[in-house]
Amino acid sequence: MSDVELVLRSTRVITPEGTRPAAVAVAAGKITAVLPHDAEVPAGARLEDLGDDVLLPGLVDTHVHVNDPGRTHWEGFWTATRAAAAGGITTLVDMPLNSLPPTTTVGNLRTKRDVAADKAHIDVGFWGGALPDNVKDLRPLHDAGVFGFKAFLSPSGVDEFPELDQERLARSMAEIAGFGGLLIVHAEDPHHLAAAPQRGGPRYTDFLASRPRDAEDTAIANLLAQAKRLNARVHVLHLSSSDALPLIAGAKAEGVRVTVETCPHYLTLTAEEVPDGASEFKCCPPIREAANQDLLWQALADGTIDCVVTDHSPSTADLKTDDFATAWGGISGLQLSLPAIWTEARRRGHSLEDVVRWMSARTARLVGLAQKGAIEAGRDADFAVLAPDETFTVDPAALQHRNRVTAYAGKTLSGVVKSTWLRGERIMADGEFTEPKGRLLSREP
C-alpha cells in the first residue's frame, strides 16, 4: 500500500457487493483496494473524507450526440463533456450523426478524434454509423476502435445519415455479426410513421399521434427476427413504447442477443404534462403517457430493459419552434440525468444501487469497458460524489451544455453532484472545472 496516493472515505460507498462504509485507495489512476472505513491512511497519501455523501462509480453514458465537428453551434466536446462532468458522468460514447462529417469511415473517425483530443473533460469513445452504402467501411471502423454501429430504420432528420431498409439492414447486420460487432438501432418503422396522421402545429397530442407505438413495435419485431436469424448482437436504442416489452422479453428468453436502453425523459416526464407548443419536450420516439411510463419502470426492475442513457441531442434554441412537426427533436440531459432518475427511482422504491447498475455497470458492460462501471480493485478511479437528499430547482442558466434549453426547467430534483473524479483526479467540484483531462477511448479487443 506504500504507493497509494489518494484515499476517498465515505460512510456510503456503492460497490458491486452493496453499499457500505469504506475507504477507497487510489494509485496511478486506478483503484487499488476497497478498505474498511476506519483503515489507516498510508503514509504520503491524501485523504478526502466525504462524510455521508455517497461515493459511486462514475456514470457511463453510451448515447450522446456531441455534434462536433460541423454543428458546434448545437454542441461540442468542450461543452458536452463539462455538462457530463457536472452530472457525475465520467465516460460518454458519441453518436456518429449530427456531426459533419458523420462517423461512417475511418477518415471521418480520425477527423472527429482530432477535434475531440484537447477538449474532453471526461473520457470519450465513438460509435460508427451503418449507412446504405458503407458496408465496406464497417470492418475497418471496427478495427479502428469504434464500439459498434448505429443504424436508423426511419429518416434520421439529417440528410447525411440515411436510414436502412430491411434488405440493407440484413446486409449490414450480417457484416457486423461476421466480425463480432454490435449493431445499435433507432427502431421506428417508416411505413407506420407514413401512415400516421401528420397534422403539425403546437398540440402535443397531435405530435404523439404522429409517432405511434406500433411504429416502434413493428421495427423492433423485425429487428429481433433478423438478429435471431443471423445470431447477431443488437441493441435497441431509446425504447419508448411499453407495448414492445413482451416481444423483447420473449426474444431474450429464446436466446436472442439483444439489449435495450431507455432514457431519463421517458422515465421522468409524461405526455400529460407537456404544454402545447413546448418543443423542448420533443424527441423521437416521443415521451408517452404515464401508464406507459409505469411499465417501463417495471421492465427496468425485471431486467427486460438493461440500462438508462441520456440520448443527449441538443440544438440551437431557434430550432425549438412551437410547431412539433418542424421543431428539432432532441432533449439535452447530460447534466441532469442522475438527479432526474434518482428523484423518480427513489419515489418508486428503488435504491441508488439500482441507479448505478442501470447507468454505470450495465452501460460499461454494453460497450466492453472492463475498466469502468464499478468501485473495485483494478478499475479506473472514476467517481461521482452525490448528496442524495439535497434538492435543487433546475435553472437553465446553471447548465453547462451549449444551448441551455431543457425540459426540466423549474423542476425540483433530488441528488446534488458535489464532485466528479476521473482516474483519481477531481475534475469538477461544486460547479468548478479543471482543464480537460479526458482520454479518447477505443473498443477493447
Curated annotation (Swiss-Prot):
Q: Which GO terms describe its biological process?
A: allantoin catabolic process; purine nucleobase catabolic process
This protein's UniProt keywords:
Hydrolase, Metal-binding, Purine metabolism, Zinc
The domain of life is Bacteria
The record lists the catalysed reaction(s) as: (S)-allantoin + H2O = allantoate + H(+)
The pathway where this protein functions is: Nitrogen metabolism; (S)-allantoin degradation; allantoate from (S)-allantoin: step 1/1
MF terms in GO:
allantoinase activity; cobalt ion binding; zinc ion binding
Protein name, UniProt field: Allantoinase
Q: Provide the family line.
A: Belongs to the metallo-dependent hydrolases superfamily. Allantoinase family.
What disulfide bonds does the UniProt entry report for this chain? none
Bilayer-spanning residue ranges: none
NCBIfam families the record matches = allantoinase
Function in brief: Catalyzes the conversion of allantoin (5-ureidohydantoin) to allantoic acid by hydrolytic cleavage of the five-member hydantoin ring.
An example GO CC term for this entry is:
cytoplasm
Which cofactors are required for activity? Zn(2+)
